[in-house]
Amino acid sequence: FADMISYKFTGPKRNSIIVFEEPIENKVLYTKRAMGLPGETVKIQDGILYINGEATNFRQYSNLGIGDNEWRIPKKGDKLEIIPAGNYNKAHSYTAIDIEKIQKELKYNSASVYEFMPNLKFVVNGEETGLILDFIHDKDVVAKLMVGETVEVTLDDDYYLALGDNTDNSFDSRYWGFVKGSRIRGRAIVRFWPLNRIGLVK
């Protein structure tokens, strides 16, 4: 079960378990912990999550999908640039582009964003950061990126770093990027699975 009311008035607090629509298929509900909040910097090094440069003691995380990079979590009003880098495959400019086919592929495999658009960079207020995959649902944005154009937008919402308790192998923000605030449906309050952990969420 989830409390669907709390976050209508205030954003999630750190370490709270949130229920949200992931940004790829745009319909699957996940439950993860909100570990990074809008405007903060996050980094995972030697299994430790750093927030604004300070080590946390919540739990150990692998840095798969992040590497040694420090990410700035976007917040409402930030300027986002999505930039196809220098070795972009210009062959796309001379062929018909099936945007719907590309969107479908990206929905099922977010990593393929780099197959279609090599070295795609996400830059917030001049700082390179992690994936922001909401754009794959906008045909106009995808079309511009496919011909090597930089897309610039002003973000209309806050974003969060969502991490799973299965810290070495969780399908979370380390793989599909930040979670937009409007995707969050509520706060998880009861756990039904696995069976040996049924009860109130803490």
State what each model feature region is.
Residues 1-202:
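Soluble "head" domains of membrane/secretory-pathway proteins
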